[in-house]
Amino acid sequence: MQRIPIIPSIMALIISACASTPSIWGVPETPTPNGAILYPPPYDPFTVNDSQIIFPTSTTPPEIATQLAYTPTSTPVDMPPLIQPTFTPSLDTAPFLYYAQSGDMLPAIASRFSADESEITSDADLTKTTLIDPGTLLVIPNRVTEPTTPNVQIMPDAEVIFSKTAIDFDVGKYVKDQNGYLSHFREYLGSTGWVTGPDAVERLAIENSINPRLILGLLEYESRWVRGQPIDALHTDYPMGFNDYHFKGMSVQLVWALNNMSIAYYGWRAGTLNYLDFPDGTRLRIDPRLNAGTVAIQYLFSRLHSQSQWSQIINPDTGFPAVYKQMFGDIWARADAANPIFPPALNQPTLLLPFEPNTAWNLTGGPHNAWGQLNPEIYGVSHSVYAAIDFAPSTDHGGCDPTTLWVTAAAPGLVVRAENGVVMVDLDGDGYEQTGWDIMYMHIAAIGRVPKGTWVEANDRIGHASCEGGVSTGTHLHFARKYNGEWVTADGPIPFIMSGWRVVAGAKAYEGKLVRGDETVIADPVGQKWSNIIRGEDE
């Protein structure tokens, strides 16, 4: 059996760098737009009280390597009061009556509420391993005895992910109409050359599957790039306020912000994130009743600001939510048109292994991040969403050598994107990546790649696996699913099944296996024999 001669120590880098985090090679001078500056709104979100709010905690949070990119000022007399955390004083309080939200699953809910799964009761059947239908009433013992964030939802899930709400939004037109700094901004990226600000925002939204409105809202709130001018020299180079020279420039600043939001959004979905750790050394538990979108916003700002400043930033009347509403209108009404993200009884459509029968491939990566390079020295020991797996064609050479083997369509659909190493196939055929099931084939070579607009049937040729798109040290296919704009975890309540093979996650990223009956294929970065898989003629 042929193997892939790739050094294990470097193979682990193959997909963790799939986000194609570009280098900033230079930023040209940007002309100052004519006319009055459109910002600020009737309040200054950066004028906050820096006095630390101390809450009791028995845990000493780890040091977060980030600096504040602002100068705190005193609080004006008429400053709105801080949103105070809620607190459950004892174990003898009434149980929570919690209505399940879209994307909820029992293990994650149990983790958020510090309860055992067996303690959670409902009239619905909770023995199933599927997602819980939205609106299902759950009775949960009150085990939360720490201060928590406010139980105030400030951002719907549909406004965080690249959902249906993003279909009719024109980034370029909106930015041009605002006539702020971003409308005239350009930067040089190693992966694309010169790119305009709006084009960079749009590409980041599509590739990271994040709502472009949210990207603009964050950029405006932290630096005023969208409707006016940067608030100071620091925010010109570090518009998201993350003061680290490795992240100098708009695109890499936004990549940092989007990665943090994804860590929180999908960590909340999975039940692996329950606390916020602030740069001032304080820690706060996340209220278990919040939705993933709200947690994503709370988490991002907790990485940038002290707890007292954060409390004012998340204030729905005077903080970031107010700025966002001023920019984009009623977010909840817009989200209602896209909800629920995951409808009841959702199942994956039938998928085939994404390569031709009787050809030798290897499972070189178990479940890992769908998109994004998450360096633990920057982001901590966290992960976003383990939605992707890797297949590599068997080869005698390894590295980025071309392959003659074909990646094939796992299901019929419309090719809605074919660029930068990515082929995205829309299975419902409506032409929108933001709706229904979508399958991502990543690292597809430009030569022989199926063009955008093509309808493919199952088994039709997509292209050849390669190292194109992102950072890769070996020819392979990075394969992932999305539904309604949200990455779907590979080993979760909607299992990733191809030709009867089910994906099972390992203890760490890239570990795992495929299981079909009594057959097992174990992921191995160098393609050893236990990772070999050959699709049968009748599969």
Enumerate the language-model features and the residues they cover.
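Primarily a LysM-type cell-wall glycan-binding module
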Residues: 31, 35-56, 81-116, 136-138, ...
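Short glycine/threonine/proline-enriched tight-turn/helix- or strand-capping micro-motif at secondary-structure
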Residues: 343-346, 362-409
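Extracellular LysM carbohydrate-binding repeats and other cell-envelope/extracellular binding modules
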Residues: 19-28, 35-37, 68-99, 108, ...
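Non-catalytic cell-wall polysaccharide-engagement segments
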Residues: 20-26, 37-42, 243-364, 369, ...
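Short alpha-helical segments in extracytoplasmic peptidoglycan/chitin-binding modules
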Residues: 100, 105-123, 135, 205, ...
